[in-house]
């Protein structure tokens, strides 16, 4: 039996994780980054950009459900949704399950990610690219929100880590543009790394977002693929009541949506905003 090739993630300098490669499906440099999609016996198909794992078939549902359904069900009546990034299609799939949403705009800087994820990760998008409500824009997210005259009810930043093409999606310019692009009562959420190992991301996002939103916080989910396990998501709005919604109302919104999830529940939603003391202390000390 031949030894399998090993792929090593390069996100952290002093520790990390590896994946055995059963078959490489695609590996090329796009116009913006190095893209590889390969098969792994335990996790299914894996996609990485510039040496950092972005998604796996095995547990992508956790990430996409939590970054979609928490803001949309908190809002309760979102008609227009903007996705920044999201080229693998998973976020689009989950947003499109909300039948009350009338327009979905996705802004992805790298057309290659969209093209090859549609080909090699079809279960992520699950046909949602053909949804008539969907509009794809190939552009830099900062540039889009800076120039956009449209308004949205929910903005989801499905960004990579703050290196390479994703770095601009952690800047004050981007957050200011998102705040300006939200309707009254709108909600902004964003991927914010594994806080235990990438605490500076949360601290930086909190400081910057607080300049443009009245209510800024974080929520979390356990996602095995991301080294360190507990992924943190930024939350920003101008109405604290949206974040503090009671369980009865959330259950009503969830039941009315008709959506069935594998990870998200209204109870998980409520619990996800209970943050560990080390994060609360770090945010307080940084003020």
UniProtKB/Swiss-Prot annotation:
The active site is at residue 158. Keywords: Cytoplasm, Polyamine biosynthesis, Spermidine biosynthesis, Transferase. CDD domains: AdoMet_MTases. InterPro entries: PABS, PABS_CS, SAM-dependent_MTases_sf, Spermi_synthase, Spermidine_synt_N, Spermidine_synt_N_sf. It is found in: Cytoplasm. GO terms for biological process: spermidine biosynthetic process. GO terms for molecular function: spermidine synthase activity. One of its GO terms (cellular component) is cytosol. Signal peptide: none annotated. S-methyl-5'-thioadenosine binds at residues 33, 108, 140-141, 165. Pfam families: Spermine_synt_N (PF17284), Spermine_synth (PF01564). Its EC number is 2.5.1.16. Residues 5-238 form the PABS domain. PROSITE patterns: PABS_1, PABS_2. Spermidine binds at residues 64, 88, 158-161. NCBIfam families: MFS_SpdSyn, PRK00811.1, speE. Homodimer or homotetramer. Catalyzes the irreversible transfer of a propylamine group from the amino donor S-adenosylmethioninamine (decarboxy-AdoMet) to putrescine (1,4-diaminobutane) to yield spermidine. Belongs to the spermidine/spermine synthase family. This is Polyamine aminopropyltransferase. It comes from Pectobacterium atrosepticum (strain SCRI 1043 / ATCC BAA-672) (Erwinia carotovora subsp. atroseptica).
